[in-house]
Amino acid sequence: MDTTELQMLYAAGERDFHNVDLCSATLCYIDLRGANLLRANLRHANLRWADLRQANLSWADLRGADLSWAQLDGADLSSANLKGAKMSDGTIHD
């Protein structure tokens, strides 16, 4: 799935994107509020300024992802791999 397809499906009301592969995708400013991204591959994805409020990111691969200024209020990050992920206040290392 590419970024355009993801945005079109989300705009049409789809919220279930579990196991989606968006490795290295550019998702700046994307609105994915409430999306199910369980076990999604978001490794090295650019998620700057993304709206991920209430999203299910459990077990997601976010290694090396750029989450600078992303909105994560209420997001489920349980068991997500955030090693090397960039945040607006620093990078996560182990």
Predicted regions and their residues:
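Tandem repeat scaffolds
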Residues: 1-94
